[in-house]
């Protein structure tokens, strides 16, 4: 589903795709915004700023140019909407996990295969306008986002912690590994991720438990 060069001829293009467990899409980006909705299954989306867990009836909004890779953790069916960036001024301005209402999912399903040359004042045009209105008010689900630390030493720790999630990690462990004070760890971690270490660890464990 890479479609790196896809540029919608209309405000919106919808693609439906089936993935099998273990499939991956390497790092890539798009010239338009993208909304990936999981109809059923489970995928992990990784960007330079974090990891995002996407399960059934949830989605991820990726802004234009956001580099991302996909890891399919369970047989998954997705709907992917490619949105022309200039079609609305008030679309979400950052990549984030979002809740998907039954209405939006039904509208997107109806829009699969719509001819890019549809006319105004037609059923197709009205469906597209309704979808664009729904995209303006997507509800973020921050608990499914795990921000990526920016400093290399913390990024290396992320891998170590991920490999031993059952360990009762504490600030003291991180301070000892980095040979700095707990206070410094707490401050630097919050500066890099916007979260306390405890909240970040809770989200990471939640993501791996899904």
Task: Label each PLM-derived region with a short phrase.
Residues 168-173, 178-180, 187, 191-210:
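Terminal helix-turn-helix DNA-binding modules in bacterial transcription factors
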Residues 25, 40-46, 59-60, 68:
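Short beta-strand segments in beta-sandwich/barrel cores
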Residues 1-43, 52:
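Generic protein-terminus/edge-of-domain signal
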Residues 97-163:
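An amphipathic alpha-helical interaction segment
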Residues 49-64:
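Short acidic-glycine-tyrosine-enriched beta hairpin
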Residues 31, 47-49, 74-76:
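A generic beta-sheet turn/junction motif
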Residues 65-95:
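Ligand-binding loop in jelly-roll beta-barrel domains
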């Amino acid at each position: 589903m890479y479609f790196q060069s896809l540029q919608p001829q209309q405000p919106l293009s919808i693609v439906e795709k089936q993935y099998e467990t273990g499939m991956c899409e390497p790092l890539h980006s798009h010239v338009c915004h993208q909304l990936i909705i999981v109809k059923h299954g489970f995928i992990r989306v990784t960007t330079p700023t974090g990891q995002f867990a996407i399960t059934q009836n949830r989605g991820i909004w990726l802004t234009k140019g956001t580099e991302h890779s996909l890891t399919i953790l369970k047989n998954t069916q997705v709907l992917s909407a490619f949105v022309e960036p200039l079609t609305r001024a008030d679309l979400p301005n950052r990549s984030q996990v979002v809740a998907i209402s039954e209405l939006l999912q039904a509208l997107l399903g109806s829009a699969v295969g719509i001819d890019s040359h549809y006319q105004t004042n037609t059923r197709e045009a009205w469906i597209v306008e309704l979808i664009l209105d729904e995209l303006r008010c997507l509800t973020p689900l921050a608990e499914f986002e795990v921000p990526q630390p920016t400093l290399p030493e913390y990024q290396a720790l992320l891998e170590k912690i991920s490999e031993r999630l059952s360990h009762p990690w504490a600030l003291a462990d991180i301070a000892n590994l980095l040979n700095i004070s707990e206070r410094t760890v707490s401050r630097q971690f919050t500066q890099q991720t916007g979260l306390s270490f405890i909240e970040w660890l809770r989200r990471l464990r939640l993501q791996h438990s899904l």
